[in-house]
Amino acid sequence: MKEININNARSQIPSLAIVVPCYNEKDAFPYCLEGLTTILKNLLAKEKIARNSYILFVDDGSKDNTWEQIKSTSQEKSFIRGLKLSRNRGHQIALLAGLANADTDVTVSIDADLQDDIGCIEKMIDKYNEGFEIVYGVRDNRSSDSVFRLAP
């Protein structure tokens, strides 16, 4: 993680939106939901994020039942939100739609296959609280790829 701090530390607990673009993720969705829910609840318990924080799943016109899973889960859990695109527009458009719909202090994006280390979300929040405006991570290897990412 590269660091350039130009601001003072923050005193207010930030709200967080985790934006997750999804396309045909019916198999990965339950694992993604479980992992991100654990992270969100952990951050809430440590009082690192505000109670109005949430996970936003953006369905990019999936042809499987990804949207149905998102919709059902969002009706059961108040910290889950869903956004459905009318058709497949591509990962970047789904990501942009999610970022545009996030209404929080901090927004983190992550792919539904959890190929990136979700444990870094807490470190990113810590950096934000130290005063950083932009925090991003770069993987230096692919040894942590999930089984979904490695599948042919």
Locations of regions flagged by a protein language model:
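Structured catalytic core of nucleotide-sugar glycosyltransferases
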Residues: 1-146
